[in-house]
Amino acid sequence: MRFSNRVALVTGAGGGLGAVIAERLAREGLTVAVNTRARTEEADAVAAAIRAGGGRAFAATANVTDPSAVRRMFETVADRGTLRVLVNNASYRPRQRVQTITEDDWHQVRSVTLDGAFRCIRCALPTLIPGGRIVNVLGRNALAGDPERVHLSAAKHGLLGLTLALAAALRDDGVAVNAVSPGVDTEGPELDRCRAEIASQVARLAFADAAELTGTVVRVDCDGSVVSAPTVW
């Protein structure tokens, strides 16, 4: 095992891509905190599957839009070990025509996708410094606008900006901050292979040397190609 008594927290891990990422990190030897918003049975099922496969995992239910719930979640994580990896995967992805998006719709998407990531990062930093790893999951919405998810595209692009700014801010603290950007929509059972490729890249970034790899967006196009390059504006 690479880490002993080390924890990775994966948000939005009750199913789909988040669950696959959680399973992959557990195979790498990390204890995984499986976060879901409110459906404890989903987190319990993913954690149980990891344990059945010989890994270590536990449920960590919290709505990332609620600062108090996020703080309590990190207290639970601290009771299980030392947090070394944070994967911000939670997002809210409604399809809406831009003409129908209300103020509440806009703020709800941002509160989960962007603000939720910031809340988790803020709580994680005391234990991530020094030497921790943050991996943010973007998506094609961040790099190419989605006409049916304008609010999500804006929030994911904000998460890209947060990734780059944090990489610069935390470099001297030995914390690597990177992002993975799936090139396709990761919803649907037909994309199991794609999810595995994405999870593999998340695991690579979780163990990357901060001095060599930070402020990088890894684009996974799910056709066998991976593009990894620093993003410079």
How does the language model describe each region?
Residues P126, A168-A169, A211:
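Alpha-helical segment proximal to the catalytic Tyr-Lys
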Residues T40, T61-R72, E103:
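The beta1-alpha1 cofactor-binding region of Rossmann-like NAD(H)/NADP(H)-dependent oxidoreductases
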Residues R97-V98, D105-R110:
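Substrate-binding pocket helix/loop in short-chain dehydrogenase/reductase
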Residues D172, A179-V180, P189-S228:
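C-terminal helical subdomain
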Residues L30-A43:
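Conserved glycine-rich Rossmann-like NAD(P)H-binding loop of the short-chain dehydrogenase/reductase
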Residues I121, A155, T163:
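Active-site helix of classical SDR
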Residues V7, G14-G15:
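Conserved glycine-rich cofactor-binding loop
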